[in-house]
């Protein structure tokens, strides 16, 4: 592949660009097929019937070869707008169990949540390939998802 300055861009010149965003949301972990006692045993305080909240941090990584004209894989301003429109506007200051359509009918674990976020974002990423989503539930707990 040729670059604008005559340099050659090789397939091995894969670059990864990550955008970080923050949002707040509430949820509870509760399996309706289990007793209250079983839920409390499995999920502890996360099964609280009055919900609990997190200050989430999301890292969205796109991979690709730099465009020879712009040098970008994806314009990070556009990536931020995509994340806002297709994720943040749907989940920020919401109850994941009750208010978020793509979480309906499933346990609101961070693992299920990151898969749902992937499905919301993937169709809208152009100019690169969605590579990874890292979702921090707390500063010490996060999940990674690669779409596999």
Question: Where do the model's predicted regions map?
Answer:
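Charge-rich, low-complexity N-terminal segments
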Residues: 1-148
